[in-house]
Amino acid sequence: MVLGDKYRTLFGRNYLMDTLCGLEFKLSMPSFYQVNRDQAEVLYGKALEFAGLTGNETVLDLYCGIGTITLCLAKAAKRVIGAEIVPPAIRDAKENALRNHIENAEFFCGDAADIAAKLESDGLRPDVVTVDPPRKGLAPEVIASVAAMGPEKVVYVSCDPATLGRDVKIFREFGYEAKRAAAVDMFPGTAHV
């Protein structure tokens, strides 16, 4: 895809399959996927490490895409909930959970701000929230809803240090503090983060 919102398969399947962190993933257009599989496994391993799961937690994963982080965390959590705005990605996430025999995952399609607000008003109190937003970072209302849910930990996967810094500052206003950070070079040999 270069530009546009219509996709046409010219040859072969209209999706890709990949194995990541021991799980099989289906990826349809226009879903996001980390192109550097080896470093993605390092990144997701760090997310799992920072989440510090024991098997009894509920995890909310905002901006879950096709469920890569959500399903990687599902192996170590009691319940995982993924949210994503791209309908084909959510369809793939649900399929990926079934494909990998993961039964403790559920997925919602919609804007992260709307879903976070709805889950918070419904009384969801996750132990851990993971976020992996696009370069623009988190909207203030997403941060407010996450903070209102009161998770013990927020694991923030960022591709833009500037928006990460901005969002950490806002989280601080809600009583959170940054405790750990790790850099993963997703694009070795380039200036990209």
What would you call each of these model-derived segments?
Residues 1-193:
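Rossmann-like S-adenosyl-L-methionine
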